[in-house]
Amino acid sequence: VPKFQEFNDWEQMKWNEVQIDILRELNQFKDSFGKDWFKEWTLPDLKYRLKNNWSFYLVEGGWCFIDWNRKYPYLCNRYVFPEHRNKGLGSDLVWLRCNEIVEGGYNTAMIKLEDWNTPALSVMKENIFTKMD
């Protein structure tokens, strides 16, 4: 698993450092459909999530969340920047969160994968998920 920073609390963030990094990445990025990511995901959104029982993991080249508010923790919003894809970082982000969930006393989690999102579907190769229809 790559070196990561875990944030469970809004006050925990080092804003001079983290905010600049996140803004730099978001301002440059467009999603798979060419839309500006900054319009989809913002710092106020991050602040809301951290104040409402989510965990945020920031690594060089990507990030991911866990939403702890459901019956089973929900692995959501995993993102790997294009230059870091196909190098195992996406799988590392899945395993990082699975380890956190087990450490939190759970043995089940949920993840939603859209059929169109081919890169995200690659986690099914890990043989740790069961497809539900």
Describe the role of every protein-language-model region.
Residues 2-41:
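Short amphipathic alpha-helix that is part of the acyltransferase structural core
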Residues 19, 25-27, 55-58, 64, ...:
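Polar/charged side chains located within well-ordered beta-strands of beta-rich proteins
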Residues 34-81:
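A conserved beta-strand-loop-helix scaffold within acyl/acetyltransferase catalytic domains
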Residues 78-86, 113-114:
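A short, internal acetyl-CoA/4′-phosphopantetheine-binding micro-motif in the GNAT/acyltransferase core
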Residues 84, 88-96:
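Conserved acetyl-CoA pyrophosphate-binding loop and the N-cap/start of the following alpha-helix
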Residues 91, 115-133:
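Conserved active-site alpha-helix within GNAT-family acetyltransferase domains
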Residues 101-113:
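Conserved GNAT acetyl-CoA-binding A-motif
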